[in-house]
A protein has these predicted regions:
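Membrane-interfacial segments
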Residues: 31-38, 62, 66, 70, ...
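Alpha-helical membrane-associated segments of multi-pass integral membrane proteins
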Residues: 102-148
């Protein structure tokens, strides 16, 4: 089964975010419509929901392409992705006006202030979560699809 390995790599990469994003959407709908959150979450939700699976799929394809030269384990490769997503998301958020960077915190939707210390803790958690997801879930899918 050596036909179309990059398509199979893309499919194994999009598996995790495609399963998790509907749960995230349900949480945001609950927050916005049921709990009446006073800020427009939907402005900052649609673009990341469309972009995250594509990034994961392309990142998986990149691993397949570069693994022979780099020898980088899949979990480590996956843990690098948040280091690209955080600056990219911050740049896009500032450009569209949903993020304002302050001296000690980030203001989100002109309503919620998030201290940089909390962002740092969440980022560290994300790096570990990405490592585990890529090592165990995407790695298993790669083996099942015959590309690992």
């Amino acid at each position: 089964m050596n036909t179309h390995p990059y398509i199979r790599a893309f499919l194994s990469g999009i598996f995790v975010p495609t399963l998790l994003l509907p749960l995230l959407l349900a949480g945001f709908v609950l927050l916005r419509l049921v709990l009446r959150a006073p800020f427009p979450i939907e402005r900052g939700l649609i673009f990341p929901m469309a972009l995250a699976p594509v990034l994961w799929g392309l990142w998986s394809m990149l691993w397949l392409r570069s693994h022979a030269q780099t020898g980088l384990p899949l979990g480590v490769h996956g843990a690098i992705l948040p280091f690209l997503m955080l600056p990219g998301g911050t740049l896009i958020g500032r450009h569209v006006g949903i993020l304002v960077l302050g001296a000690r915190s980030v203001t989100w939707f002109e309503a919620v202030r998030i201290p940089y210390a909390l962002i740092g803790c969440a980022f560290a958690f994300a790096v570990v979560a990405y490592y585990l997801a890529w090592k165990y879930i995407v790695g298993t899918l790669n083996r099942v699809l015959g590309i690992a």
